[in-house]
Amino acid sequence: MFRFVRDKASGGATGAADSITLDTPVRFDGRLVMQLVTEHSELNRRFAALARRLDGDPVIVEREVRDCAALLHRLRRTEALWLYPIIARGVARDPIARRQFVQLRLGMLGLARRALRQFDDLAVALRRGTEVEAAADMAARALSEYRMRNEAEIYPLYDFIGRRRSGEQQIA
């Protein structure tokens, strides 16, 4: 059985999110995007392996689906705690950019919820033993769309704003 829990000492993105408190200052981390991309790759790898075993023991496969959903939830939490505050600070003075960021963030929330809902639908299909392949395809598409959108829009925006703000602080 897969274990998705990582040590905080491992430096993984999930460890960073687990150690945050209300008093933790959120700062730009140039390595965070790479960590998140690595975590997304691991999630995709695990889901692809799971998809090849859909005809196996439904209880085990369902547990693996739940583990994938938990990993996606932790990735989403990391993004919400570490990426979005940096981006929000970067667009705070520009009302148009702020509105576009809110729209982008709502869109990403919708994609994440859709992916999680597809994982739930796959778990239900496994329990019922019907339409498992279709549910797995839908979950794979939702997961892929969420990742592609993050890598195309959120992560570059975080890097751009974080590097720009880091440069401004060095000049000052």
Where are these regions (language model features)?
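Small-residue-biased structural context
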Residues: 1-172
